[in-house]
A protein has these predicted regions:
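Beta1/beta-strand and adjacent pyrophosphate-binding region of the FAD-binding site
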Residues: 2-19
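Predominantly flavin-linked oxidoreductase catalytic cores and closely associated redox partners
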Residues: 26, 109-255, 268-273
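Flavin-binding catalytic cores
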Residues: 228-261, 285, 306-329
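Conserved mid-domain beta->alpha element of the FAD-binding
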Residues: 270-343
Length: 440
């Protein structure tokens, strides 16, 4: 491959997970003419995760959508399922293996974008000026395979994060042979279960997330909101208990684990001087989860990452510097902060809060809120669905005082009690239908 004058590459991408691969693939697919090197410490990719998002049919990742649902369900433990549906939008599921393969195929077809696996990146610092490189331009990255120089660096590496809450989950895609009791969670046939079996205690919210993939297979996750990250083994125990309660106990002859996934997502990320962050170096942009890709109140990030990768690649193709994720609009940021502070202040009421929004907010309004498209009327509907006083008390910003680092607190997981059966799945009465101009 040709070498960019004065640098090893125009752009070096640190970390080739979802965000790093998305940007590299966009640049490989386009015709920017930039020399790009993406490095990652992993030596290969596995089917270790999946991503979901709401969308219509008109997006360029449609070929790798493995499954979609036109209805999705919320349910408080023991209560009826509340089914949501929005015309023209589906809840779409992308397997990690398919996304990795798609991105790598685009990269491998390019003669100017290169993926280097098994390479650990270290310090990032500014380059000294030279005859061909003016002062203030250029970055050098120390890696396990030697130094790399570039005009710009996009750093997507994961790092320790301070946040108000952590969304800890453990999931298994299982072949259950048709034994999974979705009715116990109020999930109707053909629907996904986003937050079902919701229950809360003094430590926070727990719920079961179920994506039926066929008549005999499903992804089942146990999720816990916690002030600190939880031990993977303890969250996994909650997942196993949920599977057993739903009629698909691991180890049973009719149940086979196809793959597993787990993670910890920061909710209400708070910048901290002690955070493991890239120093402020000209030409360096932080992106991915560490750069604010995840929505504070939900943890959703895949669609936001794809939008950022597209915008960043377009800027680079025009000869402009890369960009990070756009800052959250003031109102959205404050609503998410107030909501998360309320979850911290009254963890035992969190299931009630989510159930109230599912019952009291029209599906199209709630969906726009979750996908960063909320209108003022949507925000007012969200506010009206929740109890006033607990949220008014959270108007003062306490996020920094509440933020916890990602140091583990192993004492916060509680055993998952048996799932109580729900009444027959039903579509609960919703607010008056929105007019066409409200939904458009």
């Amino acid at each position: 491959m040709p070498r960019t004058r004065a640098y090893d590459a125009d752009l070096v991408i640190l970390g080739a997970g979802c965000a790093g691969l998305a940007l590299a693939a966009r640049l490989a697919e386009g015709d920017s003419g930039l020399r790009v090197i993406a490095v990652d410490v992993r030596t290969d990719y596995s089917d270790d995760r999946s991503w979901c998002f709401w969308a219509d049919d008109a997006h360029d990742l449609r070929p790798i959508v493995a499954h979609e649902w036109r209805d999705w369900t919320y349910q408080a433990e023991g209560g009826p399922g509340v089914a949501h549906h929005v015309d023209g939008e589906t809840y779409q599921y992308v397997r990690g293996a398919d996304f990795y393969a798609h991105a790598r195929a685009l990269i491998e077809a390019s003669d100017r974008v290169e993926l280097r696996l098994g390479v650990a990146a270290g310090e990032v610092r500014a380059l000294h000026p030279s005859i061909s490189r003016p002062a203030g331009e250029g970055v050098i990255v120390s890696t396990s395979a030697g130094d790399l120089t570039a005009r710009w660096v996009v750093d997507t590496r994961p790092r320790r994060t301070a946040a108000m809450l952590f969304q800890c989950f453990s999931g298994a895609e299982v072949d259950h042979g048709g034994s999974l009791d979705l009715a116990a969670l109020g999930i109707a046939p053909g629907a996904a279960g986003l937050m079902t079996g919701m229950r809360a205690d003094a430590d926070g919210l727990g719920f079961v997330y179920v994506l039926p993939l066929s008549d005999s297979t499903a992804l089942v996750e146990w999720t816990r909101f916690s002030p600190s990250p939880l031990r993977a083994s303890e969250v996994r125990a909650g997942r196993d208990a949920a599977l057993a309660a739903l009629g698909a106990p691991l180890g049973a002859p009719h149940v086979r684990v196809l793959r597993e996934e787990a993670g910890v997502l920061p909710m209400g990320r708070v910048p901290s001087p002690s955070a493991d962050a890239t120093p402020s170096v000209p030409g360096v942009v932080v992106a991915g989860a560490a750069g604010g890709a995840l929505r504070d109140a939900s943890g959703y990030g895949f669609a936001r990452i794809q939008a950022w990768a597209r915008d960043c690649a377009d800027r680079l193709a025009r000869g402009e510097a890369p960009i990070g994720h756009p800052p959250e609009p003031f109102i959205r940021r404050q609503m998410d902060r107030i909501f998360l502070q309320a979850l911290r202040a009254h963890p035992e009421r969190t299931a009630d809060y989510f159930a109230a929004m599912a019952r009291g907010v029209a599906p199209a309004r709630l969906l726009r809120f979750l996908t960063d498209r909320a209108r003022l009327s949507d925000l007012l509907a969200i506010i009206a669905s929740l109890p006033l006083l607990p949220f008014l008390a959270q108007l003062p910003d306490r996020s920094r005082a509440l933020a916890t680092s990602s140091a583990r607190r192993p004492d916060l997981v509680r055993a998952l009690p048996p799932v109580r059966r729900a009444p027959a799945p039903q579509r609960e009465p919703q607010p008056q239908p929105e007019t066409a101009d409200q939904v458009a």
